Design a protein with these regions (language model features):
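Phosphate/oxyanion-binding loops and surfaces in catalytic or ligand/nucleic-acid-binding neighborhoods
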Residues: 2, 131, 158-165
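Core AdoMet radical
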Residues: 2-22, 34-51, 62-82, 90-123, ...
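Catalytic domains of carbohydrate-active enzymes, especially glycoside hydrolases
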Residues: 30-31
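Catalytic cores of alpha/beta
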Residues: 146-162
Length: 174
């Protein structure tokens, strides 16, 4: 990775510094001044970021959650942090949508996505379905890879079982 110019140490440090001093501060300011209308939580795993949980709680505390639309791309490996539960927060907001990343079901999904506990993912997804008021609030985000091609039928069956849509994207390896 260090051979790639955008990953070279000085640039990486500059980006991190910019993110920490500029981007995060602008986000915090937008929360505190109630100017945020939409948040798209993605990249890495947003539910692992303490900032996510603090910001969501703060928006509710400030009393303007009903004016904010919240979207996620998440692997749903976590749905709570320090006693705060995602699916208790989301109904407080104007609207929300979760696209949950999954590459396959069961052992195949666990093989493709390192760290996936499929049964835990399934419990978390069903927990979201229980609070969802519309079909688009909880969707499967299926990345089709070579091993994942073997999972097409299982993923379709899962979407039928859960009564949810599948959004697909193809992963190219070149």
């Amino acid at each position: 990775k260090d051979s790639q110019p955008w990953m070279a140490s000085p640039l990486r440090e500059q980006i991190t510094h910019f993110q920490d001093t500029q981007v995060v501060q602008e986000f915090v300011d937008a929360v505190e001044t109630k100017t945020i209308k939409e948040i798209y939580w993605c990249g890495g795993e947003p539910l692992m970021w303490e900032m996510h949980w603090k910001a969501m709680q703060r928006i509710i505390e400030l009393g303007f959650a009903k004016e904010v639309y919240v979207r996620y791309n998440t692997n749903l490996s976590r749905t709570s942090l320090k006693g705060i539960k995602l699916f208790d927060l989301l109904p407080e907001f104007q609207d929300w949508q979760i696209c949950s990343s999954l590459d396959g079901t069961g052992e195949v999904g666990e093989y493709i996505r390192d760290g996936l506990n499929y049964e835990q993912w399934l419990r978390n997804f069903k927990e979201g379905l229980a609070v969802a008021k519309t079909a688009r609030e909880m969707r499967l985000d299926y990345t089709i890879t070579m091993p994942g091609l073997l999972e097409l039928k299982n993923m379709f069956d899962l979407s039928q079982e859960l009564n949810t849509e599948i959004l697909t994207k193809v992963m190219f390896t070149f």
